[in-house]
Amino acid sequence: MGMYKYIREAWKSPKKSYVGELLKQRMIKWRREPVVVRIERPTRLDRARALGYQAKQGYVIVRVRVRKGGRKRPRWKGGRKPSKMGQVKYSPKKSLQWIAEEKAARKFPNLEVLNSYWVGEDGMYKWFEVIMVDPHHPVIKSDPKIAWIALKHHKGRVFRGLTSAGKKGRGLRNKGKGAEKVRPSIRANEGKGK
């Protein structure tokens, strides 16, 4: 087996391999860090490379922390009975991974999100690493594999649900019977696809 296969096998079941103990130690540190942190190199090299990461200029890895659970909406100032406050039992209709990608994109507005992957979770938080690309960097523009991201119609792609996590959340992994209301978009079908 090659190196990447060993890494992949270890991450498949973290609690049974050496990864579990490593994650315990890392998360003690990660909990004290800010929500969005730029890091030097990917934690899961096999996953990052499979999703398009290259160790060259123009690529940035960002670790993002997202709180688990449904969305708690802002509290009303006006009076009403607690059951009509409309605070709980609302889901954001997005995966936590998609939310993590958006957080990273807001922190680094000059970069575009390429993809992301899971790196850990505890009882309260999930952590994702987001692969980001600088579309204005000459190294990126001259690489035919990734030069497409510099085109203007890929600007702000994460906010339009064009990343892998975004497309999954919009139901675009499915086609045929049962997927009639997801194309051309959720909005075009008046939200019936959600």
UniProtKB/Swiss-Prot annotation:
Quaternary structure and interacting proteins, as annotated: Part of the 50S ribosomal subunit.
GO biological processes: cytoplasmic translation
PROSITE patterns reported in the protein's UniProt record: RIBOSOMAL_L15E (PS01194)
UniProt name for this protein: Large ribosomal subunit protein eL15
Species of provenance: Pyrococcus furiosus (strain ATCC 43587 / DSM 3638 / JCM 8422 / Vc1)
Annotated Gene Ontology cellular component terms: cytosolic large ribosomal subunit
InterPro entries: Rbsml_eL15_core_dom_sf, Ribosomal_eL15, Ribosomal_eL15_arc, Ribosomal_eL15_CS, Ribosomal_uL23/eL15/eS24_sf
GO molecular function, one term: RNA binding
Residue ranges with Basic and acidic residues bias: 177-194
NCBIfam families in alphabetical order: PRK04243.1
Keywords per UniProt: Ribonucleoprotein, Ribosomal protein
Comp. bias intervals (Basic residues): 167-176
